[in-house]
Swiss-Prot record:
Disulfide bonds: none annotated. Residues 708-729 are annotated as: Disordered. The active site is at 450 (for 3-hydroxyacyl-coa dehydrogenase activity). This is Fatty acid oxidation complex subunit alpha. It comes from Escherichia coli O81 (strain ED1a). Involved in the aerobic and anaerobic degradation of long-chain fatty acids via beta-oxidation cycle. Catalyzes the formation of 3-oxoacyl-CoA from enoyl-CoA via L-3-hydroxyacyl-CoA. It can also use D-3-hydroxyacyl-CoA and cis-3-enoyl-CoA as substrate.
Amino acid sequence: MLYKGDTLYLDWLEDGIAELVFDAPGSVNKLDTATVASLGEAIGVLEQQSDLKGLLLRSNKAAFIVGADITEFLSLFLVPEEQLSQWLHFANSVFNRLEDLPVPTIAAVNGYALGGGCECVLATDYRLATPDLRIGLPETKLGIMPGFGGSVRMPRMLGADSALEIIAAGKDVGADQALKIGLVDGVVKAEKLVEGAIAILRQAINGDLDWKAKRQPKLEPLKLSKIEAAMSFTIAKGMVAQTAGKHYPAPITAVKTIEAAARFGREEALNLENKSFVPLAHTNEARALVGIFLNDQYVKGKAKKLTKDVETPKQAAVLGAGIMGGGIAYQSAWKGVPVVMKDINDKSLTLGMTEAAKLLNKQLERGKIDGLKLAGVISTIHPTLDYAGFDRVDVVVEAVVENPKVKKAVLAETEQKVRPDTVLASNTSTIPISELANALERPENFCGMHFFNPVHRMPLVEIIRGEKSSDETIAKVVAWASKMGKTPIVVNDCPGFFVNRVLFPYFAGFSQLLRDGAGFRKIDKVMEKQFGWPMGPAYLLDVVGIDTAHHAQAVMAAGFPQRMQKDYRDAIDALFDANRFGQKNGLGFWRYKEDSKGKPKKEEDVVVDDLLAKVSQPKRDFSEEEIIARMMIPMVNEVVRCLEEGIIATPAEADMALVYGLGFPPFHGGAFRWLDTLGSAKYLDMAQQYQHLGPLYEVPEGLRNKARHNEPYYPPVEPARPVGDLKTA
């Protein structure tokens, strides 16, 4: 053994060939600060071996290196800029020394090689991969950019266009694509990986492969003519501006850095990467996006822990076909859980099956599946007008009309047709689960399972625990949701549960703004362009459906009359009475026409102005700051109340539900992350300016206490140790 660290070791293989093996104590390898330091020590040992002829890098895990240790990021991002820059210089010196070894090097890459893992293998001369490879640089999705030389080496290896596509979008690619663009040199079966890598090394050692020529371009300026450079970088900047926008500075910074570094060799190019990385790491956007990643890991870990003792349902059923039922059936079947889909109407069944088939055909068109796979999946969805097969299902989700009487009748009837241990769930969006449970003989086997539309795209499923829902029931439904590829978050029961309960105060803020003379077009523009929502409130209401919102608004008002009961006729009422139901009938706040792809495209419709004038004061202008404050305060206050009342368990789960269920702007990180960034005292000052608008603007006492003591909702993070300590971590 030449070297043994906590996460890697170095040993001789044969005849002057050494192997450096990543083998962390956990289930995966991460390139954390300790591993970077250990890698530097191992390379120091290699530099002393006069008989070294070649080096093989490999992993003892199912994945090579999944990336940097993101749990370290928030503390690293608090380190002063100069210290962070010094540590990056140290880390890059490690990879430079790996790249500069006077012998050929190869990485045998299996599974994931992401972020720092990808940057590590870019420093070797050759890369041999297995078919399960996923390799790339996802840093821009975390609000930063590659910091271990990825933005320098990848463009010089692949060319500017391919590298920009991966780096700016934070993409990873599979084995075939990686081979095609030159990111790896070959793909072999897993059992042949080490053998194949040694064979390539031998060819390089023997002079059959010119490893020095392979290495040289990574040390030099990017080979690109002025015209080629102008085209590549102009197109890339245009694409990034269009897709990322101003709220996500990392992608455009990465592109500009690669452009600026193109005319320099490795050392100066790495200095430019360093100078760009450090300011990005200190942005609120980076902290928020890293926070989302960590919250996602927390939520998924909680679901995994909750379901460790239950069996995932093997057969499911959906009550109520149509678009929603068909979407749920598709998602379950697509992920391997067969479904019985029942409806009382043949047309609805046809609609549900058509929806499932349409979604499968999209997969076929994209080349994700072949005709055989399509036929296989669709054959596991069984449409029926009766209860045939319900005696074999493990879980049933009801997705009929949003009417408590209808839902109770359907659920009570279904309970008599299934096994005593079968779990029933309702896809209601607003009706309290405990109320629906009153119709059942076995309420302990019942809970809520709130999907979001469109089911195949929206990652969140709210799992609602009723007063009598058993732990086993919740666990089984969480297991099914996880199997479907969704992110389940368990909430306690109340009208609207969590997501809709906090959404409707936001809509109420919108209605009050309109009533006071604000224009919905400006509100939409401000909330989209300035705050960063994917849709403004008017557009979102049109997508949800004005009729759906009108009904849900009444349910929420009955559930929370003190805050959500209104004593005036609002814009939603006016549009509902005029039969303007939104996208579903082409008329809402906006008018909708289908584009060439059959998708609804919004257009101006001056008719709506006359309707709104009847429920609004004369038009007046509102500042962007006032619009954002009046829209967000009711939502944030309600989010805080839900935490204080135990409807949602943690700030992390609340923020993920908002991001995954409503599209809360990820660069803000969710309501609690936004609050912490703004500061609770500053938020309180802002909210008090609008408390005259009514109870929705009254800040909950718990938040007032936070403001008094200057306490955040997320645990405070301590800065990482000084750079000198980090080197020897």
